[in-house]
Swiss-Prot record:
BP GO annotations: dolichol phosphate mannose biosynthetic process; GPI anchor biosynthetic process; protein glycosylation
Pfam families xref list: DPM2
Function: Regulates the biosynthesis of dolichol phosphate-mannose. Regulatory subunit of the dolichol-phosphate mannose (DPM) synthase complex; essential for the ER localization and stable expression of dpm1.
Complex formation: Component of the dolichol-phosphate mannose (DPM) synthase complex composed of dpm1, dpm2 and dpm3.
Keyword Transmembrane: yes
Gene (UniProt): dpm2-1
Gene Ontology CC annotations of this record: dolichol-phosphate-mannose synthase complex; endoplasmic reticulum membrane
GO terms of molecular function: enzyme regulator activity
Family: Belongs to the DPM2 family.
Name listed for the protein in its UniProt record: Dolichol phosphate-mannose biosynthesis regulatory protein
Length: 79
């Protein structure tokens, strides 16, 4: 494993920690903060807290299903 692989992995972990912290703050903490507070300007409307993960879930499941379907079709052609 080269140094570039470790660096890319480290950057991905840092990005994931940032996304987790941002999403957790957005969904769990901001509903208890007054809506005209300055911190609210850094977050999308709360509806997107549900819409974005649902869209990602649907896209992910579709990609996995498509991949599995293509693998099954390809394996039948080889027989």
């Amino acid at each position: 494993m080269g140094a570039s692989d470790k660096f890319i992995g480290f950057v991905m972990v840092l990005f994931r920690i940032f996304v987790f912290g941002y999403y957790t703050t957005w969904v769990i903490i901001t509903p208890f903060i007054v809506s005209d507070h300055w911190i609210q300007q850094y977050f999308l409307p709360r509806e997107y807290g549900i819409i974005i993960p649902l869209v990602l879930l649907v896209v992910g499941i579709t990609a996995i299903g498509t991949f599995l379907g293509l693998v099954m079709i390809k394996s039948k052609k080889n027989k």
